[in-house]
Each structure stands twice: as structure tokens, then as C-alpha cells.
Amino acid sequence: MTLKDPFNRPVSNLRVSLTPKCNLSCIYCHREGENDPKASLSAAEIAEVLRVAAGFGIRSVKFTGGEPMLRPDLTEIIRTVPAGMESSLTTNGTLLAGLAADIKQAGLRRVNVSIDSLNPETYKKITGTDVLSDVLEGINAALKTGLTPVKLNMVVLKGINDHEIDDFLAYVRGNRDLVLQLIELMNFNDCDHHGDLNGLETSLASRSKQIVTRRMHHRKKYCLDGAEVEVVRPLHNTEFCAYCNRLRLTSDGKLKPCLLRTDNHVDIRGKSGKELEDLFIEAVRRREPFYT
């Protein structure tokens, strides 16, 4: 059975926040909407959610945070992913070097690494920490262990790191296992560092040898002389909503039908079996495009 919302959008992807905790203090972080953190779901509770999700035809799960690698039971959680469901993880990379082999062995398919600067001073300004070398070591470990393709998530911050895009292109160029994702800043509080990415996309298009539209997200992938780049633009983007195929689960057990809303969550904590299945159906019923 495949779940479809009232707008005929199938749900095939689940994002699971494992913890609101993080070891960085990024200046723009919205913590996946978790501003009032409570106790996180246990590994057993997450396993039951994944079992039900698989029964509804959800074929991929991405573990997020906070920083998911702060969970001491991370490998246990990864091992509970049902057969046939692809698992990936978004991390800040600071702990990745020490865990890459273990999470790969547990069954994780690949990772996204959040890295907003290749300059140590700028990185520290953005994250509040001086650990860029650890992140770069983690990326290398992910490549070595086959957690690929490794997608590098760079949030574009006007006046801080927007001049580094060519540096990132040089970093990924020539390595087919690295993909650069340039992400529009979520401008919730009129942040001074939000910038319009129209000019950036125009520039990428003019420099590209090939432009491919990804089927899953209907997102363009720009191929620039050995470098693959995607631009992620969730704000005021009708296509982002029209092709959305995911549900989100907060670390304390609430299904989020929409990234940009906080008024339609479905609390599933402590539920299992048929009751949990019904709540999944209700969460999908509440899905509607934020931008139309």
C-alpha cells in the first residue's frame, strides 16, 4: 500500500530526527523545527515506526538531528531499518571519522555532511567551533568506507560564505562520489544573511556542460566540468511543495506533514500496530502544499 495525500502526492520518504542535541552552534540553525525538545524516542520506538512506514511503501529513511551521531545507540537504530528500505544520514561530520566504518557495517547507505565553509576562520564564525579539520577527516572516512555518494550541504549565507562557492566546486571536482548541495537559508526571522539564489542558478546554468532534472525532487543538477551541484530552494517554491514526497518525525515522536508548518503535527509517541498505522494515515491526510 502506497500512501497518497489529498493532492495525490505519494509519500515514499521519511526523515527521522534522532535528537535535538548538537555539538555545534550554527548561527542559522532551526533544529528541524524542534524548539521545545523533550525526551527522544527509544531505538525500539523508532524501529516500530520504521516497520509501519515500510508497510506503507516508504522506501527510504534519512536520519537527522540535531546531530544524530550523538546518539550512543545509533548503530542499533540503523540495524532496525527494514530490508528494502534505503537509509542515509545527515551529519555535521565532526564525529564521522570515528563512526564511518561502524555505521556502514550496520547498513547505512550514504551520508550528507553539513559544511558551510572550507576556511577555518569562517567555519568557526558560522558554527562557533574550531573543528573544520575533523569534518574534512570525516568526509574522507565516508568516501573510504563507501558511504557514497557523499553530499556536501552548504547553506549559502550572504556576506559570509557566498564567495566560497567556487572553492567548493574545486573541492568536489573530479570526484564522482562527492556532490555539492547549495541550500537556500531558511529565512524565518528576517536573517540578514538570506540571499536570493536566482543569480546563482543562472550562473551555474551558463557554466554547465549538462543540466539534469532529478526525478525524485524535480530538482536540477548542474554538471560543471567534473563537479555536480544541486540547488535546494524550499522558500516560495511551488515545485518544492508539488514534488514533496516525505514525512518528518521529530525526535520526541511527532509526525510533521510539512517542513514549514507547526500547527498540524500528529503525536505518535507510545503508539504501535494498528493505532500507529492509523496515525500515519492521518498525518498524510493533513499534507497540503505550503506554496501553491
What is the predicted role of each segment?
Residues 188-292:
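Accessory C-terminal segments flanking Radical SAM cores
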Residues 13-17, 30, 62, 151, ...:
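Conserved beta-strand segments that form the floor/walls of ligand-binding pockets within enzyme
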Residues 1-13, 21-25, 197-212:
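Flexible, acidic/Gly-rich N-terminal and inter-domain linker regions that tether
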Residues 1-16, 25-27, 55-60, 219-238, ...:
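N-terminal [4Fe-4S]-dependent radical SAM core
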Residues 43-63, 67-178, 182:
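Radical SAM/AdoMet-radical enzyme domain recognition
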Residues 5-44, 259:
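Canonical Radical SAM [4Fe-4S] cluster-binding loop centered on the CxxxCxxC motif
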Residues 35, 155-160, 186-191:
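Short histidine/acidic/glycine/proline-rich micro-motifs that form metal-
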Residues 34-37, 119-126, 190-191, 266-267:
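A short acidic, helix-capping loop that chelates divalent metal ions and anchors anionic groups
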